[in-house]
Regions:
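Alpha-helical linker/edge segments of TPR/alpha-solenoid repeat scaffolds
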Residues: 14, 79-92
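Helix-start (N-cap) detector for alpha-helical repeat units in TPR-like alpha-solenoids
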Residues: 2-3, 36-37, 69-70
Length: 92
């Protein structure tokens, strides 16, 4: 199988719902482990399913590859939401 030609583009994968996209991204990342955009998209898909740990791990991995990745903004967003929730738990 010619993986590059038989595989949907990241743009197409990004349009799919999370449950369809994540397995495709998992396979894509086997062949392209340093693709920060794929990691960011997978992180966003995980976030949409409330898989917070997996999302943050993907964002951090993307940032190791490319410190200017859009994962930077996604991670800041995730941290701000988690900080908000933690404050509510401490100060009901």
């Amino acid at each position: 199988m010619n993986f590059q030609n038989d595989f949907p583009s990241l743009e197409d994968i990004n349009k799919l719902d999370a449950l369809e996209a994540i397995p495709l991204l998992d396979n894509y990342l086997i062949y392209n482990p340093n693709d920060d955009e794929a990691l960011t998209i997978r992180g966003l898909k995980h976030w949409s399913l409330n898989h917070r740990k997996e999302a943050i791990n993907d964002y951090l991995q993307a940032l190791k590859i490319n410190p200017e990745s859009r994962a930077k903004m996604a991670l800041q967003f995730a941290n701000s939401i988690l900080d908000y929730y933690n404050k509510d738990l401490l100060n009901p």
